[in-house]
């Protein structure tokens, strides 16, 4: 990461730097390109008059955000121009994981292919049955440790840059047995961390619960409708304003 001059002093449009899981770029029928105007990061960017750098992947936790912020050269390039940073993760952290995350993520590397398919199918059978009693993918204290490591590293390179974090979304996914008992402990841990470090929070549940629980999202029961994306964008703009970001309309 770099501590070079910010966009305000170079004449470039500021960048909204978003670290995210798939909730930020999936719609009601599947994944979308990072520049799709219907997903919340681009709705927010349009309202602010900013560019957007969306760095994410399906299944990412707050631990992956740390790795992306410190190892992905896109984040190094975006940070000097960033007007604000959003941590749009924590949902995967709070979902049940019958296998330890490291083992689950190694399934993709199993060889030969027939064995990988067998292991994946087996895990797909086990996951919804064991999810109601499984631990979260990341313990809440580990989630906030990675959030703080990332926030501190970003603040070291860009002192005082506005940062907004997120509380977990909700789901009705049969693949997880509709279980989400890890959400409340994760919410409590992130809330305490955010209060300590004065980080505004966006409660994704508040934005999307009606759509998700009403069955109006993606059929997988996890990802959102475009109406939910618009609701997230609205709350994200409020969180950014709380962090000190001025919207384009209010600045004129």
UniProtKB/Swiss-Prot annotation:
EC code: 2.3.1.273
Reaction it catalyzes: (2R)-2-O-[alpha-D-glucopyranosyl-(1->6)-alpha-D-glucopyranosyl]-glycerate + octanoyl-CoA = (2R)-2-O-[6-O-octanoyl-alpha-D-glucopyranosyl-(1->6)-alpha-D-glucopyranosyl]-glycerate + CoA
Entry-linked InterPro entries: OctT, SGNH_hydro_sf
GO MF terms, alphabetically ordered: diglucosylglycerate octanoyltransferase activity
Keywords: Acyltransferase, Transferase
Entry function: Sugar octanoyltransferase likely involved in the biosynthesis of mycobacterial methylglucose lipopolysaccharide (MGLP). Catalyzes the transfer of an octanoyl group from octanoyl-CoA to the C6 OH of the second glucose in diglucosylglycerate (DGG). DGG is the preferred acceptor, but to a lesser extent, GG (glucosylglycerate) can also be used as substrate. DGG and GG are the two earliest intermediates in MGLP biosynthesis.
Homology family: Belongs to the OctT acyltransferase family.
Assembly: Homotetramer.
Protein name according to UniProt: Diglucosylglycerate octanoyltransferase
Gene symbol of the encoding locus: octT
């Amino acid at each position: 990461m770099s501590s070079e001059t910010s966009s305000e002093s170079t004449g470039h449009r500021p960048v909204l730097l978003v670290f995210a899981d798939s909730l930020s770029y999936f719609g009601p029928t599947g994944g979308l390109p990072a520049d799709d105007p219907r997903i919340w990061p681009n709705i927010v960017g349009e309202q602010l008059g900013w560019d957007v750098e969306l760095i994410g992947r399906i299944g990412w936790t707050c631990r992956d955000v740390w790795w992306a912020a410190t190892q992905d050269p896109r984040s190094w390039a975006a940070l000097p121009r960033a007007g604000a940073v959003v941590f749009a993760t924590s949902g995967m952290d709070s979902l049940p994981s019958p296998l330890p995350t490291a083992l689950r993520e190694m399934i993709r590397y199993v060889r030969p292919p027939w064995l990988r398919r067998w292991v994946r199918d087996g895990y797909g059978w086990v996951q919804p049955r064991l999810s109601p009693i499984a631990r979260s993918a990341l313990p809440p204290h580990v989630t906030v440790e990675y959030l703080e490591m990332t926030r501190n590293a970003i603040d070291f390179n860009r002192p005082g840059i506005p940062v907004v974090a997120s509380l977990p979304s909700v789901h009705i996914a049969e693949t997880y047995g509709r279980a989400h008992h890890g959400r409340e402990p994760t919410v409590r841990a992130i809330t305490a961390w955010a209060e300590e470090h004065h980080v505004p929070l966006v409660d994704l549940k508040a934005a999307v619960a009606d759509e998700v629980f009403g069955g109006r999202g993606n059929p997988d029961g996890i990802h959102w409708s475009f109406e939910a994306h618009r609701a997230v964008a609205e709350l994200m703009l409020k969180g950014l304003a709380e962090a000190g970001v001025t919207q384009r309309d209010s600045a004129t």
